[in-house]
């Protein structure tokens, strides 16, 4: 089983890919009239079902429950969120930890830093241009013309070796997915931490979030 987070344009790409490869999936979206439901006539289910293809109306708390109960092969984060960070925020009582991000900034080339603040950093080898649709991630970026000296995954490992770095695996041109097993390992890892950095990256782009656990009374 696979989970697709978001039923928009990129969620539809994920459905097409999974159908072509004969893999089962559940789409999760807050909108029961999302593009994926309309285009693929997905059957709505109040929760995980035995159907090979289904739609569940829900938010990130729903995704977390499905992740923990189904232990999916892959999670396709097609919605505009940092899925690992947001799932941790749902599961644990967290607040941003900007100081950890500020400590990383000097270790990253300015040319790749797209956004930084409030405990979050976004980096890209294509900082100032739009990405090519369904890009194959060649060594020389077709938009910025930057020749990548390493992947963003490797750059993050250098800049923040203590972070939990999730890899966005290339499933098809322009489409990445996280391994369900690695997401679950991350959530188990967070249980042992008072503060931490989590990152998700592919060859070209990446996002980091820093958190600390709120003190309970």
Question: How would you describe each model-predicted region?
Answer:
Residues 1-19:
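Glycine-rich adenosine-cofactor-binding loop
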Residues 7-12, 78-85, 118-119, 127-131, ...:
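Gly/Ser/Thr-rich loops at beta-strand to alpha-helix junctions
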Residues 20-24:
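Conserved S-adenosyl-L-methionine
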Residues 26-32:
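Conserved acidic E/D residue at the C-terminus of a beta-strand in Rossmann-like folds
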Residues 33-38:
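Short, charged/polar "capping" segments at the starts of alpha-helices
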Residues 39-44, 50-112:
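Phosphate-bearing ligand-interacting subdomains
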Residues 114-188:
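A conserved mid-domain beta-alpha-beta active-site/ligand-binding segment of alpha/beta enzyme cores
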Residues 182-217:
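Extended, charged low-complexity segments
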């Amino acid at each position: 089983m696979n989970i697709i987070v978001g039923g928009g344009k990129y969620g539809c790409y994920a459905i097409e890919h999974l159908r072509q490869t004969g893999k089962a999936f559940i789409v999760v979206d807050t909108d029961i009239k999302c593009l994926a439901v309309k285009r693929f006539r997905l059957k709505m289910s109040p929760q995980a079902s035995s159907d090979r293809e289904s739609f569940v109306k829900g938010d990130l708390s729903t995704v977390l429950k499905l992740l923990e109960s189904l232990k999916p092969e892959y999670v396709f984060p097609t919605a505009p969120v940092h899925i690992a960070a947001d799932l941790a925020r749902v599961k644990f009582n967290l607040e941003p930890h900007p100081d950890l991000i500020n400590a990383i900034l000097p270790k990253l080339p300015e040319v790749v830093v797209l956004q930084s603040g409030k405990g979050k950093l976004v980096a890209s080898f294509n900082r100032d241009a739009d990405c090519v649709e369904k890009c194959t991630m060649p060594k020389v970026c077709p938009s910025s013309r930057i020749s990548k000296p390493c992947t963003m995954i490797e750059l993050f490992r250098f800049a923040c070796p203590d972070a939990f770095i999730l890899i966005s695996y290339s499933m098809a041109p322009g489409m990445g997915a996280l391994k369900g097993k690695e997401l679950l390992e991350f959530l188990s890892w967070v249980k042992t931490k008072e503060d931490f950095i989590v990152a998700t990256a592919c060859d070209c782009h990446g996002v980091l979030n820093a958190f600390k656990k709120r003190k309970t009374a």
